[in-house]
Structure formats: C-alpha cells, structure tokens
Amino acid sequence: MALPSSHDVALAAERRSAARLLLRHPLVTADGPHADAFPLVRRHADWLAQRFQQVLGYRLLVEATYARLFKAGLGPGSGHRMERSTGTPFTPRTYAYLALALSVLVTAPEQVLLSQLVADVRAAAVDAGLSIEDSGRPVEKRTLAAALRRLVDWGALTETDGSVGSVAAEAGGEALLTVNREIARSIVAGPLTQSTDGADLVLRSADPGFGGPRTYVRRRLVETPVVYLDELTEAERDWLRTRQRREAEAFSELLGLEAEIRAEGVAMIDPDDELTDLRLPGTGTVAQAALLLVDRLVRRLRPDEAGHPAVGGRLTIGVPIPPGLVAELLDELVEEYGRRANWQRGYLDSPALLRADALELLSRMRLVAPAGPLRADGHGVPPWYERAAGDGRAVTDVSAARTAVVGEWVLLAAAARYATTVSLKHADQRAAQPDRQGEPSS
C-alpha cells in the first residue's frame, strides 16, 4: 500500500485543525479571537460542510466574514452552561436577557445607542410577558451587562464608542454600538418556529433527524466526556456496539481523537486536551477538592465483580452514594488539606457551597450524576423517535447497571480513572509516586 504524500498529510492536518476549531468554537469570525484560523476554515469550507453533515448532522455556514457551525443539543439535562469571564455560570436571568437582546438585534439598525438597546430589550420583555425589574439594582445591571458582553464576544455587537459594561455603571453610562445582524440571526440553532415552549425546544433540538441512532450517538461521543450505555436507547446501544471500532478510526482521522472502549461505554480522548472546557486535575479549591473527593468515593464504593457480562462479570455503570457520605468526606478533606493548601476562605466557611460546587464539577465530568430516569428508559426521547433495535437483535441489558433512589447521587464508572494510590519504589527508594489504578473493567 502506497504511503500518503506529504501534501496529503498536510491537507489532512489542515482540515483536522479547522474541524477541531469549529467544534470548540462554533462561531468563528474574521476579526475575532480566532481570526488567524478563519482563512483555514474558508479554504476547506466545502469539505468541512460535507463531513460535518455526514458525520454529525451539523450544518456549516461559511460567509465572507464569519463561519457558523449549527450544533444540536443532546436532550434534557445535557446542555453546556455559559459562563462569564470570571467563570461564574449564567443564571436563568442572564439567559433571558441574552435571548431578549438577540430578538432585538435581528431587526436593529446598523448602529444603536446602548440606552436605546436597553430600552428595546425591556420592551421586548413586556411583549414576551416577562417581568424585568427596572429597579436599578447593581446585580440587575451586571446581569444585563454580562449578556451584552457575550454578544460582543460573538461579534453580534461591536463597541464603536464606549463599552456595554457602562450599563452597569452607577450613573448609567452610554455607548455607541454597531450591530451585525447576520451574525445575530445565525446564533440561534434550534427549531424555534416549531417549538411550543422551552422544554419542547430542547427536545426538538436533539432530534437527529434521518440519521437516527447513528447521528445521535456520534454527537454524544464528541460532545460529552463519557457515553454510558444506559444513556442510550436500545437502538443506539445496538448501533454503538456494532460500529464502535470503525467509529474510533473515523474520529481519529477527522478530529484526532482516541477512543477508550469499555464495558460501561465509550469515551473519546483528546491527546492534545483542547476540545474540552473542563479540567480535572485542575487548579483552584473546587478542582482540588473534587479530585480528592472522587478518589475517596471510589475507595469506599468500588463494586465487587464488576466487569463485562460476556466474561462472567456484572455490568455496573453506577453505584449509589449513601446520603451524607459526600459531606463526611469533604469535612475530612477540609481538615486535612483545606488550610495547608490555602483553599478559598469562602469554601472553608461554607461546607454546603463546597459540596455543591464539587459535585457540579464531577457531574459535568460525568463522574457522578443525580439519580433519575435515563434515556434507556425513554427519558428525553421524542415520541416519534425509534427506540428499539431492529430485527429483534439482542442488545446489552442495562436495566440493573445503575441502581439508586431518585434524589440521591450516583458514582459513575469513569470515576475509577481518578482513584490514585501511592506505590513505593524499591530500587532507590527516592520517593513515593502517585499511580493510576482501578480502571473500569472492559
């Protein structure tokens, strides 16, 4: 077999870089933070559009000044939250301001004063039947400013004179803004006109269309840290198990991802660690506490006889975390490490806050999850979507793979990757080194 030429290798590398950029940043502008890579997207626009449509069912729009990849959702409970530059997550009110501002911008003049934009947003809220307080409270102003700042980051607004941040000024500042209506119109990706309310929009946005299980599973593989089998319908599990090796090769070629295939599910690993906005291990109090917490949870709760049913094991995707155990372990960690590691005073004074934020991070990493109905049981599946595998084929039974009472937390299989131990080197006795152990059985 002939080896690929240097031209072919370079071409594949360029296309892979462009595809990875669009997955990480679905809106790329010619003068935005990724302007250097925008010509690369333009150069391979046709190939990228074809591949994204074929593989993930995503539409790619490439114009002279921007490129927009219209990604789909994954259904209830699977969204990626937006955050301010400080890392503070958007509140429902921030999302409401963002949606209202977008509704104004799609028909706004090319230039608008900040005060006029704010007035139009309040008018749009009235039209939508939403209650927007005009109390002048600083927190309300900062919330509005955060939503407008996101529109500036996306390129839908340009600060021609002044800053959108002046809306939060005590005296009420002014600014001249330039509106890019094309970008504003391209931001919303879901089927708004077909949806009856927010919940229906989330459900319809996740519909993979004619691609069915194939498209949904592929989207889940690239958009989430881990795909567990019980988070898939019977038809999706059947498709994944029969195609997982070929899919691993395809994702390696398209995006440079490496597949980790185990009995409990599949994870796509990015060797360059670029395609994720989550880091664990990480810096900061929450990341440190979460890493130590998950290690101790695994040591306490590791199930016996877990493994692959085909070789005599018992498929275990999640085990219940007893009520009170997380608080108990975090109290121990604060006592052992909190002051020595200079954890933030706010977390040391508020165990409940530390518990909530640590669980939130572990949940986003798919290492723990609140107990509740699953997609394998039909939760979040549109009524028109085919759930059963065809031809009566036998599919992995996941009915007892995750047991817990609704309202409790569940420790998930991938958490075992973060259970560390200390081993002593006998050769020179230089130091004790951390090691990984306890991988989920395959």
PLM feature spans:
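C-terminal functional regions that serve as terminal interaction/effector modules
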Residues: 299-307, 325-442
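Short acidic, hydrophobic short linear motifs in intrinsically disordered regions
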Residues: 18-39, 110-133, 227, 308-309, ...
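Eukaryotic partner-binding/assembly regions in large regulatory complexes
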Residues: 1-85, 162-177, 181-281
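Positively charged, polyanion-binding regions of nucleic-acid-associated proteins
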Residues: 23, 92-113, 287-320
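Accessory beta->alpha helical hairpin/"wing" motif in late/C-terminal subdomains of nucleic-acid enzymes
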Residues: 65-73, 145, 149, 154-209, ...
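Internal, well-ordered domain-core segments that constitute the primary functional module
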Residues: 101-178
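Short, charged/polar micro-motifs that form catalytic or ligand-binding hotspots
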Residues: 34-38, 87-92, 103-111, 134-141, ...
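Short amphipathic alpha-helical interaction segments
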Residues: 40-51, 135-153, 347-364
